[in-house]
Amino acid sequence: MRIITGTAKGCRLKAPKGMSTRPTSDRIKESLFSILGSLVPDASVLDLFAGTGGLGLEALSRGASHAVFVDASTADIIRENAEHARLLENAEIVRREAIAFLGHLAGGERRFDLIFCDPPYHKGLWEKALVMVDRGDLLLPGGVLVVEHGGDERRLPELRALECVREVSYGHTSAIRMFRKKEALKEAGSP
């Protein structure tokens, strides 16, 4: 597990011991950031269920301006990885359950260009987080919410403001869905 490119290219990331964290593979991360492309530089990033911090740190390495990492149990690992990658200055690390943190943000002023949501699979957490981002209006216009979930977790909750614009499956193991605000899609001329 490493940072693929940017200012911290090649930096190895430390993972917590045990199987409670399932980091996004380098292959999936490379594919994801290839799709995101020009959205990353100068972006404000929220990395939910951050684990090692790999997604947010990759975004910082590629030029994102600031990243908030939220995880109840791995804040120390994230801090260590951010320090090792020399990206700590632009990182804010929150030791809190991601769903509770989203509840705290809802209705507030804070919004993000890019939100990563990569919770443990098969626990219903991605659906809860998706609905909270949707109802809490946490995504800036033109921003993207990226959700990684189990490949067999197909059912989408009802959404008001967000629409799935892309889905990529990685076998039966995992899938990534990308969401944008419906109003931003209409303004851009997308269906």
Model segments located where?
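Class I S-adenosyl-L-methionine-dependent methyltransferase catalytic core
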Residues: M1-P191
